[in-house]
UniProtKB/Swiss-Prot annotation:
The keyword Transcription does not apply. Keywords: Allosteric enzyme, Cytoplasm, Hydrolase, Metal-binding, Protease, Sodium, Stress response, Threonine protease. GO terms for biological process: proteolysis involved in protein catabolic process. Protease subunit of a proteasome-like degradation complex believed to be a general protein degrading machinery. Na(+) binds at residues 162, 165, 168. The active site is at residue 7. A double ring-shaped homohexamer of HslV is capped on each side by a ring-shaped HslU homohexamer. The assembly of the HslU/HslV complex is dependent on binding of ATP. It catalyses: ATP-dependent cleavage of peptide bonds with broad specificity. It comes from the Bacteria. This is ATP-dependent protease subunit HslV. GO terms for cellular component: HslUV protease complex; proteasome core complex. It is found in: Cytoplasm.
Length: 182
């Protein structure tokens, strides 16, 4: 059976704001199955935001596991991500899941990959999924050449990716965290 795939998730951190946004398209082969999926959500008492690219059912399984790790480690993002990655590498069922998570709190942004890797990106920018390269290029240009907010950069970059990538649409879900202490 063909795999559900294709999406674009973008995270930008600028100033005291971190934003993760994603499109709403779910594709099976060359057919759009759903146009308004919610691939970005808030976790752990609204202190963590996360988005996924990859198989939808796989991603929901990972969201549940990641949220359980956040609860276990009292919202400590890096510790929860590392523990999930350890499980991902050693659990026979998890190893078969095909998804990538982009997660962020007020202090850190991380990519958790299907290989069980935890990566902290350079330049406070994460772009995953089929439209990721388009969104990343747009976001980098906007970050370097404008004073737009993180939310505006995510919106504009995802719109550009949606105009280029056939697996990405412009039905966006955007979540943001503001750290007033910075």
């Amino acid at each position: 059976m063909e795999q559900f795939h294709g999406t674009t998730i973008l995270s930008v951190r600028r100033g005291n704001q971190v934003v993760i946004g994603g499109d709403g398209q779910v594709t099976l082969g060359n057919t759009v199955m759903k146009g308004n999926a919610r691939k970005v959500r808030r976790l752990y008492k609204d202190k963590v935001i996360a988005g996924f690219a990859g198989g939808t059912a796989d991603a929901f399984t990972l969201f549940e596991r990641f949220e359980a790790k956040l609860e276990m480690h009292q919202g400590h993002l890096i510790r929860a991500a590392v523990e999930l990655a350890k499980d991902w590498r050693t659990d026979r069922i998890l190893r078969r899941l095909e998804a990538v998570l982009a997660v962020a709190d007020s202090k850190a942004s991380l990519i958790i990959t299907g290989n069980g890797d935890v990566i902290e990106p350079e330049e406070s920018l994460i772009a995953i999924g089929s439209g990721g390269p388009f969104a990343q290029a747009a976001a980098r240009a906007l970050m370097e050449n404008t004073q737009l907010s993180a939310k505006e950069i995510v919106q504009k970059s995802l719109t550009i990716a949606g105009d280029i990538c056939i697996y990405t649409n412009n039905n966006l879900t955007i979540e943001e965290l503001n750290d007033e202490g910075k």
